[in-house]
């Protein structure tokens, strides 16, 4: 077993028999020799210049002749396994299992069926069924109806609104007792009351609102006459007609007017 010193780098034996005096290692620098050409050790073996091998012209000619004979022999056999013509179908067989063509064009099969005669000569399509057989199979299939919509679309909602509006027109509107002796009583409340807007040409349903208008929104509203029965004068104010889309007309507002 040897122990190496860090200073002298000389081996020191642990046995007394192999002991030697420690000596330092002296390295002598030598100049490299001046060579005219030095081999490049970084060049891979594949990029080195290949040596010209001796080629026998007679053996090369013999190999060419055998290859030509083999190619001619394989081409002469009709059912050779290496030729794709073995798997081609005759015109009679193609007519038996022809897929559905588009506009009677044989080269449009790629548009209607997954198997194409243009790319694949041996299609695996089954003969087409008759029209009656196909209709019977379609009639026997269970049809899945879409779930019924809970919310009505725009057309159904308009039909329902028009029907309820026509029913409310036929019925007499309940009148509310006049407030403070006013001449024009307030219109009654109906659950489904609508009106026609002349500016938009549509029906508007006032479902869920407190008051339902019975007049056209574009008619001029006049102030009601002052009440003479009570000391406080009541003036009925209504919102003026708007030129924009008439979606909602606010009901009449009665404000007490006190004289100073």
Swiss-Prot record:
PANTHER family, per the entry: SPERMATID-SPECIFIC MANCHETTE-RELATED PROTEIN 1
Keywords of this entry: Cell projection, Cilium, Cytoplasm, Cytoskeleton, Differentiation, Flagellum, Mitochondrion, Nucleus, Spermatogenesis
Cellular component per GO, a single term: nucleoplasm
Alphabetical list of InterPro entries matching this protein: SPMIP6
Record bears the keyword Nucleotide-binding: no
Subcellular location: Cytoplasm, Cytoskeleton; Nucleus; Cytoplasm; Mitochondrion
Subunit: Microtubule inner protein component of sperm flagellar doublet microtubules. Interacts with alpha-tubulin.
Organism: Mus musculus (Mouse)
Pfam families, A to Z: SMRP1
Similarity section: Belongs to the SPMIP6 family.
Major localization listed first in the record, in broad terms: cytoplasm
Single GO biological process annotation from the record: cell differentiation
Induction info: Up-regulated during cilia assembly in IMCD3 cells.
Protein name: Sperm microtubule inner protein 6
Lineage: Eukaryota, Metazoa, Chordata, Craniata, Vertebrata
Function recorded in the entry: May participate in intramanchette transport and midpiece formation of the sperm tail. May play a potential role in somatic cell proliferation.
Gene: SPMIP6
GO terms for MF: alpha-tubulin binding
Keyword Transit peptide: no
Knockout mutant characteristics: Deficient mice are viable and have normal fertility.
């Amino acid at each position: 077993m040897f122990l190496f010193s860090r200073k002298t780098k000389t081996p020191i034996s642990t046995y007394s028999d192999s002991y030697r005096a420690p000596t330092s290692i002296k390295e002598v620098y030598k100049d490299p020799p001046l060579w005219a050409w030095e081999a490049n050790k970084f060049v891979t073996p594949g990029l080195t210049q290949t040596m010209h091998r001796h080629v026998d012209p007679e053996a090369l000619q013999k190999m060419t002749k055998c290859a030509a004979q083999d190619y001619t022999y394989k081409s002469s056999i009709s059912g050779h396994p290496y030729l794709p013509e073995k798997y081609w179908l005759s015109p009679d067989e193609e007519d038996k299992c022809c897929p559905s063509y588009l506009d009677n064009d044989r080269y449009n099969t790629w548009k209607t069926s997954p198997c194409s005669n243009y790319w694949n000569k041996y299609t695996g399509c089954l003969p087409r069924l008759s029209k009656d057989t196909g209709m019977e199979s379609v009639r026997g299939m269970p049809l899945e109806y879409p779930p019924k919509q809970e919310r009505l679309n725009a057309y159904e909602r308009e039909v329902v609104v028009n029907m309820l509006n026509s029913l409310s027109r036929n019925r007499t509107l309940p009148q509310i007792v006049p407030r403070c002796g006013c001449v024009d009583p307030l219109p009654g409340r109906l659950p489904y009351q609508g009106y026609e807007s002349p500016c938009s040409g549509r029906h508007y349903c006032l479902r869920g609102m407190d008051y339902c208008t019975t007049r056209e929104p574009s008619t001029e509203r006049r102030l009601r006459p002052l009440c003479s029965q009570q000391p406080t004068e009541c003036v009925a104010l209504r919102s003026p007609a708007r030129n924009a889309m008439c979606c909602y007309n606010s009901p009449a507002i009665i404000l007490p007017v006190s004289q100073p």
